Every structure is written in structure tokens, then in C-alpha cells.
């Protein structure tokens, strides 16, 4: 074994780019909070706090109570996240998805539910095996500790792959994963050992990963450690690894596949699939480093027979083809119905083409890439064999004469087109200028500049005939080119627009205007024309990936037509059931939380078809009826949530080496046992005998499934909607009774870090371990909650986590000190400071509950954390200004409520406060959500009044000083002692009466709703002639109504609180916060020159300040003077 000291410096220094993440300056407060977190994590583990079981069959016999009745007595919650793949450490993006289940589980516990959050580890498929095999080669190249690796070979941050050119038609229902994620994860590292080193694995240990099984032993414990440090409420008894490394899970997957086969959901036959020639097998989504979600695109490939070679082509091919060979240029088209209008055939002048043997005496002129696809689709004579007779450049082909099948022009010429791509189709394009704006523009260009392009003018002047008639034109492409003022093939933006318009109108509204199907709709004629061409031997089916796909082994993939086992997703009856379930019209389907998520699912259901479910390379469970194949990774991961329910009955360790509480051997888990557990069949004596499992044990496992199923929520990134999440739903519908289908799914956007995409190559990247070590678990969890909800991308902001450390530490210190404070008030609560604070806490508890129930965690955090702290601080300031201590009962109530409402998000801090500050005997993880009275609308209105009035006073002073600067005021000096006069009124201006009457007419007090829509209401207001001042007035009244203030008070033009008493109570606080020497409150009436000084017993005084007239009930006006 090599001395580690001798390892090349290049390896030792290998790292991701310098970190762009925030640098912390002091860690004492953080370290204190982390010490608390570690203490409570240990307690939770020792006490088995998160181990959750269904009610036993001893307490409730299986046949004595239905699952629904049992859940009524003992409510449950069951949530899962897509299990992570075990080829690396969890990163902050994983944590974001985990956090959603975490918060949900924590809140469910507080609702009194038995909340189950289990976790497994996905190891199936190509990635681990491919990485291990790469490592074997690298060890051969560089030595066991890579000591022969040279420093100048280090690739510190290869640039991400260039973005693909935009597609002409983008299917907005498809979510395609951006494989910049690969660069983000690897940091652009060139070799597998570099990737592993970037994960913090010592160089001396990396060689162990050449054994794929070692990955299964290394990464799952790391995953568990990271999630435990995060404070996850996971029942770790139920953890497992996939593949045949765990014989129990292996038995489960065999059952799943057997039953799908019996249901005729799995079939065998030839189908197009993305294929890696290098790997020798299909390349499914999880096997790809680029191109996740990409599907085969099927074309019609035409056979344009060469009738006369251009001189240069004849010279280039001289002696390379058999005498009398039939040679065809083979353009691939998506619009076979337009072939009647072919006027030429385009090639890229600079592109390299090959002349490939397709059959005896038959050759195709196409690109090398197209040949690779055709070789595996039964098009060439020998399967998988590419025989190239000659190479030729596109410029040599120009002027070649070819036969154009179906075209009104029997023979057409090969002409140049610079925009032909070698990476799309066959590199040969047939031209139909009647219906293709691109072709029309190019033909016009060629006819204008024949000498420039090296052609004869007449080659580009063949007559354009009408092939398709549309409502707009019989020659749609020329019409659009003229209308959009397209003057050149380089007018890309206009051409893209024209192409979209031409395709949509031609296909959906077009009528065939030429050929055997004249008069038929294009939609119905298209497949007929295609079949006619194929039957005549003038065309054949050809397929290729719709975009670039690269396997994890580095192979650019092709499409193969091959015999294989596939799951028949998209089969009509199956698809219809799923579509209806997702559409959820009757409210009994699946809840997707957001319309965008539902729309994405419906789109995928529309296009998703057969899916290859087996492969020959990688890790996994063997196909039961054909053990030469392995079940692929997106097919063994669709219903494993059901496995969670009984995993702890089967085994005690990840690999199933130690039997679980049921004392069952893996060989006893025959298909019939799974059928019984999952409520597909009833129990028989024969099954008990055959399996050797006692009836009591079988019943107990069935109880676990019956109780926890269906799954209440599944959380995953939105990029799994096109595959895993849709497969998950399809399989549940096929395998389980209706009452066990999933209830909800939440798709998240991707997580940004500090407003930028996470990427190792830029240094803007953090693992979950990094985040928790840097900020602690609770601060990280707060920042994840603050990052956002919904399907759009969210943003983890490190400043939020950093500031949370200070908030939690400071609040902890305040709580500890305040609980010891013997000067706190006792006795009755007062009607102002105490009453407002008490009411606000009640309101925030109920608001937080609502947001938790709606899984709106950013809003829940605002109510439960930020607003709770603000309410406390406002109470402290109000009491200090009034010269009174805080009330002991309210302080204790605040501390209890603050700990409880933040528990789902920040459980460590909450449990510390609960047990060590409040002295509660049991963990807060067992506490219930607090029951508090509904908020008093009058007190809520008074609280809002205090806040808005305080803010308005600050604004009023600034406005008055601004006027003074313009010469309008000269008698107020803000540097001298200040006096504030507050003008209040009890009556609304008379002009407002008619709008009050209007609102009374359209507001339904019984239901708390508006009888007419806003558009009609605004129209009626506009007709009354005072829109500018009336609209804000009506909107303010509507807001108060919607906020719950009694309608009779608002519509009778009364405030729900005593404004005069509130203003007088505010005076001490205003003096302190606004630096006032004196505050005077004057009650005024409309049109009067006098008012009542409420601060002087109601004495009548003269009112001269003009802003006195601006006062409204609930909206006082202000005037500053000097004392």
C-alpha cells in the first residue's frame, strides 16, 4: 500500500472552488444552541420519541373495528419524501424537501396524531455500479491512492455544458431536469476519485468504493447521521436499503413485479427506448448525467433516391460503391403529409456525411449520429453493425438530383442550407416551402443569390403548390413570411414565430388540398400519408432522442428498437383512472396543493407511454420470471411507502441480516403474504401453513398497513413529476384497493443559495452537514421554512440562519432572566397593554395553526416566530412607557405559547424552553397544539390602530418638516422640546354616508361575503362621482369587514373599540418613542372651530390647525409645535 505522504500534491489540493458562502465572525451563541440540540437529539433517541406503531391487534382485534373507525379513535399521519440516492451526501436541496415533511410531522404530532415519518435509501440502478467501475479503471491508471496522478491534470471547475438551443415547440407540461445539477454536485471534477474526495472522503479510503457494495455500507449511515443532526422526526426502525442486498425488500419488489405482470401492466415487445451503446442497455432517467426526462422522438425518414450525382459527389464516391447500387438521401420529417410539396433537398455544406450500407445494394446518405440510431432500430441489415462505404461533405452533394416520393416534382435538386444541424434528424432536410416558413425563406434567398451559393438559379425556382388549405391561406408559409416581413433565413425571431403559427394552424385547422386524401383534415390524413409512404417502400420509421442524452458512463445515447420488458403506462383505461384522480373534480382524488403541480401531472399523464422496467447492468432486484434482467431504479421505487409500514416487523438492520419483531425469514415473505398484508386477499389456513408465519403476526402486519395507509403526503422536487411521482400514482392505482391510494403530493421548486443556483463549481454549495455545522439545526430549519413554499424555486438565505441564532439565543436569555424576575406584576390584567398582548397572542396562535394546516410554512414561521417576537417586544415597550412591570401570567403564557407554536419548525429550542425553563416533565414533542380563545376583533382593531397611529405620527412629523423646508411652516423647530396635538373625531364626514349605505346594501353580514363582484361595485361607485376619495374609503371598510370586525359596528359608522380611551392610553408610550414633551388629544367635529381637549377633562378649546379637518374615525390627524 502506498505511503499517503507520497500522494500527488494535485490530489491533496483538489477541492471545489473557493466557497462563496457566508463567513461567520463569532460562534459562541451558535455553539451554545448546538450543545442544546445535541442534548435533545440524544434524549429523543434514547426515549424512542419518534418510534410510532399502529394500535395493536390485542387492543383492537383486526376484525372488530374498521380502519376508518380505528383512525377516528386514534388519528394518524403518514408522510414520506422520495428516498435519496446513496452515491453522495445530502445537500441543502435535499434538506429543503425533508423540511416540508418535518414540519408537517411535527404539527401532526401536536394535533394528537400518531405521526409516522420513515426513511429508506435508494441504491438501485446504474449510478453506483458505473461509478465503482470508473474507480476500478482509475486505480489501474493512478494507483490505489492515486499517487501517479499528476497535478496538472486537476480539473478544478470545468465549465458547465452549454445550454441547448431552444426548441421550436416547447411542451410546457413537461418538467425537464436541468443537468447542470451534475456539475453542481461534482464541481466539474474529471475523475470519480476527485468527486469522492470532494465529499470529504480521505484519499486512503477511496479505493474501497471500487466495490459497489461498499457504497451501500458507507453512505446510508452518513445520511442517517445528517438527518439526526438536523433533528428529523424519523422512525429509524423502518430504514432499509434497496436492491437484493436486503432480501426482504427484494421479496417485496418481486411481489410488485409479479402482480403487475399478472395484471397485464408489464408487457414484452419491441419498443423505442433511449439506449447506451457503451453500456449495452436502456438508459433510463436515473442513469443519465444529462437529458433527464428526454424521450424518443419518432420521425418519418424518406428515401430520396439519387438519380444523378453532382460532379463533386461522383468524384468523391468513385470506386467506393458497388456498380448499380441504390443510394438514398434520407431526410427525417415530422410532417409527412406535406411531402406532395417537396421542391428540393437541403444539406449542410460544412457537415460531414457518410454513405452507410442499409441492405444489399442499398445505401443511405446520413450523418454518423443518425447511423448509430438506425443500427439499433432494425433499419440496417445487421443489427448493431454500422458499415460505412464512404465519407462525403455536404458541399459536394449540392446539385445532386434525387427522386422525391409523392412530390408534384418528380425530381428535385440537393441545395445548401447553413442551418441544417448534425445533431438533429439525419442531417438531411426535405424542403416544402408551401408549409414551412424556414424553407420558404431559404428558397427565396437561394433564388436571389444563386452565384453566392454555387447553384443554378432554376434549381431553386420550382413551382410552390398548395398542399394544405387553412382559414388564413392556401399557401400559409409564404403568407406568414410576407406578413412578418421575413427578408432572410437569418431573421430567426420572426421565423420561430412563423413556424409556430404555421404548425398549429396547419395541423389543427388544415384541410388537405392535394393528393389521395384531398378534402380530409390534416389530423386524420397525416398518419395515412405516412403509412402510404412506408407501404410503398419510400419511407421508414426512424427515432432518436428528442434532445441530447448522456449516460452516467459518459456515453451519448441513441434510440434502439428492442425487445424488452416494459410497464404499459399510458394504456387507455389505466390512464383515464389516473387522470380523473389527479383532476380531483369530486374532491376525492389527490390533493396537489398548487394548480401548477396539478397541471404538470396532467401534462405528463397525457404524453407518458411505455417504460422499460428492466436492465442487465447495475444494482437491483432480479426480474422474477427472467433473472437475466434487473428491475430498474424507477420501477422498484414506486410503492415502497407500503414497505415502510411493516419494515420493522421484518428486520432490525438496513440489510435484513437480523430478523425484526415478527421473527420472519425473508424466504417466508412469499407473494401471497404481501397480498394479505396489503389487503388484496383474505387470510386462509393454507397461507399460514405455506408461509410458516403465525396468524397473529400476519394480522399485526396487516394492521400496520391498514392503519397508516393511505399515505397522507409525499414530498419531492418538481423534477420528479415526469417520472417517479407519476409512476408512483400509476402503481398505487394498479396494486392497491381504492381506499389506499395516496391522499396528497407536494412538489417543491429547486433551492437556491443566497439568491444564486447551488453549484460546487462556483463555490455556492452547501451539504446538509455543512449547514447544520455552520448554523445549528434550528437556525437551518428556520431558514428553510423562510426559503419559500410552492413549485417555484425557493431561496435559502444564510443571513436568515445567522440572524436566527441571535434571535433564539437572545430570547432564551430573556426567558431565563424574566422567569426569575420577582418584580413582575400579578393580579388582574389591565385593559390596555395586557389585554392587547393577550389578544394578539391568541390571534397569532390561531393564525399559525391555519398556515401549518395549509402547509404554508413561510407564513407559519412569520406568525409563530417573527410576529410572536414582535408582539412581545411591543408589549415590553408599552409597559415600560407606562412605567409598569410586565404581567407574570402573560409572560408565562408567552413563553409557553412561543415554545409550542415554533415546535414544528425549531423543536430543539422549543424543547429546551419547555423542559428546562418551564420545568415540564415530558418532551414538547408529546405536547398538543395550544387551545386559545378566538381573537377579539375589537382588541385586534385597537392593536392595529396603535401600530398604524404610531407609524402615522412619525410620518406626520416628517411631512410637516418637509412643508417647513418649502417655506409653508416656520413655527416648529424639531430640535426644541416638542408637543404633539392629535385630532380625533367620532363622526364620519357627511359625504361618506352614501357609500356606507351602498356597502350596507351589497354586504351579506350573515355570511361575511359581498353579494356582488368588485367590478360591479366599482362601477356603482364610479357613477356616484367621487371615485378618487371614495374608493380608498370603501376599500378600507371592506378590509375591516373581512378581518372580522362586526358588520353592524362598521356599517353603522362606529369603531369596534374606544378610540378616545386608546389614544389616552397611548400617550406615555408616544412620549417615550417619539421624544415628546407633551401630547394633547383633541376631539373635533366637522365644520366646527372648537374642540374638546380630552387630556384636560374635555375642556373646550379653539382649533386653528388646518389638518384638524382631515381627522376621521379611526384615522386621527396630527400637528407638531414646540412647548
Swiss-Prot record:
Keyword ATP-binding carried by entry: yes
Residues engaged in binding ATP: 760
EC number: 6.1.1.4
Single GO biological process annotation from the record: leucyl-tRNA aminoacylation
Motif 'KMSKS' region per record, residues: 757-761
Keywords attached to this entry: Aminoacyl-tRNA synthetase, ATP-binding, Cytoplasm, Ligase, Nucleotide-binding, Protein biosynthesis
Family: Belongs to the class-I aminoacyl-tRNA synthetase family.
Official protein name in the record: Leucine--tRNA ligase, cytoplasmic
